[in-house]
């Protein structure tokens, strides 16, 4: 029996190995989160490896998005990115090593022959597999080598015994070697295949723990056998359950998954994303909201879940709102300023707002009403740009009957000190003189100054807006 063991006291080294063939979504990035967190928790190293041997589908644009997504989330690697396409010489050397040791052999079976074999096996209700026609055996006569044909190189898989490993998520898994055929290590043009490259990379990069999606479980016994053929012990494996979308399908580009960078653009916070993704397959008791530092302190492989996790955008927004509320106002102000600058607000005006704390106070006033930084920037924008109230709210609150009171309020505000107590006193004065209640005057004031009747305290609102803007918006109605 072939078995794997933990890597003893070796320094923990994990990896994330994406293919740059499209945008990276939340299911992909979760496969980076756990190895990154485990390396950080154990004081180890996190390696980024780019599996780009599929040159027809790989692109620099896709790679840039992977790097951008990881940088935004603060999951930058200790080493890499390493590119498989830059390691071809090393792969060729190891292929030659395997062939010289009798662990690999050339196979000249054509595609047509393989197709015919597959059809025959399916007709006989057998599992389709390579039949070993070109596998050298003592006393066996191999078919004649076809003229002008380049062979594939196949791995000589053990024919007896069991390959087994203790998966940190799924428990013990055992596969009989006679269920595995001789997989292709290199194509006719000499290009090495995925399962071979992965093993060579994991050996050369001294990977101790492979934490990846459970769609790789079927690859694992084949990879373990290649490790042993090369005289190396395989790493510890942890195969993560699938992430499902809100309809219960596997989260994928085909089924509506969004790029990670889109969540950034929609106003999600990196630490909130880390929090949410961590809970999408791992738990620490009943803790739902935690910081990045807490996650890295608590994380281990023992609490990874075995069941598929389902993405829930409403839960993500709720978690984001909790992180937004807990975030320091000046840090939020910097994020909001960047968004407002992209919307055309003058850089100097924003710089002044950051320097004098005004933008931080705006964020403090509105952040409890927001679940994204985009929503918060929408509120902040009314302090820097012209406002057009919704016609329904204007018609409801800014009536001819209230016009005298609005004029009186503008007059009172033009001569008072500009702070919350003085603004509140001006309102009381006008309410008393006009015989009104606070909502009758506060609602139209809110509509005219920020475009909606539903805001925090009106005196706090007006103080932050500044006398000049407030008077202009009250009078130019």
UniProtKB/Swiss-Prot annotation:
The lineage of its organism: Bacteria, Pseudomonadati, Pseudomonadota, Betaproteobacteria, Burkholderiales. It comes from the Bacteria. A motif ('KMSKS' region) lies at residues 250-254. Belongs to the class-I aminoacyl-tRNA synthetase family. Glutamate--tRNA ligase type 1 subfamily. GO terms for molecular function: ATP binding; glutamate-tRNA ligase activity; tRNA binding; zinc ion binding. GO terms for cellular component: cytosol. Monomer. Its EC number is 6.1.1.17. It is found in: Cytoplasm. A motif ('HIGH' region) lies at residues 18-28. Keywords: Aminoacyl-tRNA synthetase, ATP-binding, Cytoplasm, Ligase, Nucleotide-binding, Protein biosynthesis. The keyword Glycosyltransferase does not apply. Its main location: cytoplasm. HAMAP family: Glu_tRNA_synth_type1. InterPro entries: aa-tRNA-synth_I_cd-bd, aa-tRNA-synth_I_codon-bd_sub2, aa-tRNA-synth_I_CS, aa_tRNA-synth_I_cd-bd_sf, Glu-tRNA-ligase_bac/mito, Glu/Gln-tRNA-synth, Glu/Gln-tRNA-synth_Ib_cat-dom, GluQ/Sye. GO terms for biological process: glutamyl-tRNA aminoacylation. Catalyzes the attachment of glutamate to tRNA(Glu) in a two-step reaction: glutamate is first activated by ATP to form Glu-AMP and then transferred to the acceptor end of tRNA(Glu). Transmembrane segments: none annotated. It is an enzyme of class 6 (ligase). Residues 128-138 have a biased composition (Basic and acidic residues). It catalyses: tRNA(Glu) + L-glutamate + ATP = L-glutamyl-tRNA(Glu) + AMP + diphosphate. ATP binds at residue 253. This is Glutamate--tRNA ligase. NCBIfam families: gltX_bact (TIGR00464). The keyword ATP-binding applies. Residues 128-151 are annotated as: Disordered.
């Amino acid at each position: 029996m072939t078995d794997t063991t933990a890597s003893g006291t070796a320094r923990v080294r994990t990896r994330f190995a994406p293919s740059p063939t499209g945008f990276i979504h939340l299911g992909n990035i979760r496969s980076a989160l756990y190895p990154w967190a485990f390396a950080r928790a154990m004081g180890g190293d996190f390696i980024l490896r780019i599996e780009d041997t599929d040159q027809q589908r790989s692109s620099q644009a896709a790679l840039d998005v992977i790097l951008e997504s990881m940088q935004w989330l603060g999951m930058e690697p200790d080493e890499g990115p390493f590119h498989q396409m830059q390691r071809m010489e090393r792969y060729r050397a190891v292929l030659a090593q395997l062939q010289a040791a009798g662990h690999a052999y050339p196979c000249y079976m054509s595609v047509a022959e393989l197709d015919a074999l597959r059809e025959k096996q399916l007709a006989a209700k057998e599992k389709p597999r390579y039949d070993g026609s070109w596998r050298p055996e003592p006393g066996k006569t191999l078919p004649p080598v076809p003229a002008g044909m380049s062979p594939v190189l196949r791995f000589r898989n053990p024919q007896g015994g069991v390959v087994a490993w203790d998966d940190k998520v799924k428990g013990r898994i055992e596969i009989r070697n006679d269920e595995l055929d001789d997989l292709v290590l290199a194509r006719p043009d000499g290009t090495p295949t995925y399962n071979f490259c992965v093993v060579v990379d994991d050996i050369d990069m001294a990977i101790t723990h492979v934490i990846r999606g459970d769609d790789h479980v079927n690859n694992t016994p084949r990879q373990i056998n290649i490790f042993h053929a090369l005289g190396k012990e395989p790493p510890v494996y942890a195969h993560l359950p699938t992430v499902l979308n809100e309809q219960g399908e596997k989260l994928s580009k085909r089924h509506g998954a969004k790029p990670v960078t889109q969540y950034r653009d929609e106003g999600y916070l990196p630490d909130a994303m880390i929090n949410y993704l961590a809970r999408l397959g791992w738990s620490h008791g009943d803790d739902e909201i935690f910081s990045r530092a807490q996650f890295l302190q608590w994380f281990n492989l023992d609490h990874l879940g075995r069941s598929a996790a389902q993405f829930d955008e409403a839960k993500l927004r709720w978690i984001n709102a909790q992180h937004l509320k807990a975030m320091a106002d000046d840090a939020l102000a910097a994020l909001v300023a960047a968004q407002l600058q992209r919307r055309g607000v003058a850089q100097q005006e924003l710089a002044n707002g950051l320097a004098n704390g005004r933008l931080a106070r705006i964020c403090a006033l509105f952040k409890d009403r927001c679940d994204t930084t985009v929503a918060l920037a929408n509120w902040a924008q009314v302090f820097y740009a012209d406002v057009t109230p919704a016609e329904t709210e204007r018609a409801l609150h800014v009536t001819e009957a209230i016009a005298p009171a609005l004029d009186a309020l503008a007059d009172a505000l033009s001569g008072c000190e500009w702070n919350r107590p003085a603004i509140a006193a001006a309102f009381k004065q006008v309410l008393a003189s006009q015989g009104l209640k606070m909502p009758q005057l506060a609602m139209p004031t809110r509509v005219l100054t920020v475009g909606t009747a539903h805001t925090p305290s009106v005196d706090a609102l007006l103080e932050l807006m500044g006398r000049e803007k407030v008077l202009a918006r009250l009078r130019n109605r």
